[in-house]
């Protein structure tokens, strides 16, 4: 990943966090890493943990196409690790935030 892509990712996550806070979410953690993968944002709302993948672009391709079954499987393993590491067993869902040309699309409770 180049520097521009890295900085774009941070910018996208910043925008996503701002959006989520306006929607009443509490941001618990950003960029949670495990040997299985990474979760961009971990947030909480109404006692439910939300593990949020952020996809950001300023180009013309569809950002949601960058999340596939393999990436989702890595996210699920990372969520399991997060639960074990923190000694919790709460309800959760996986969400996707797509940001394209400053338009935010929030897809809740995604699956394949």
From Swiss-Prot:
PANTHER family tied to this protein: UPF0102 PROTEIN YRAN (PTHR34039:SF1)
Domain of life: Bacteria
Record-stated family: Belongs to the UPF0102 family.
The protein's name in its UniProt record: UPF0102 protein Cj0148c
Native source organism of the sequence: Campylobacter jejuni subsp. jejuni serotype O:2 (strain ATCC 700819 / NCTC 11168)
Molecular function GO labels: nucleic acid binding
Pfam (any one): UPF0102
Entries under HAMAP family matching the protein: UPF0102
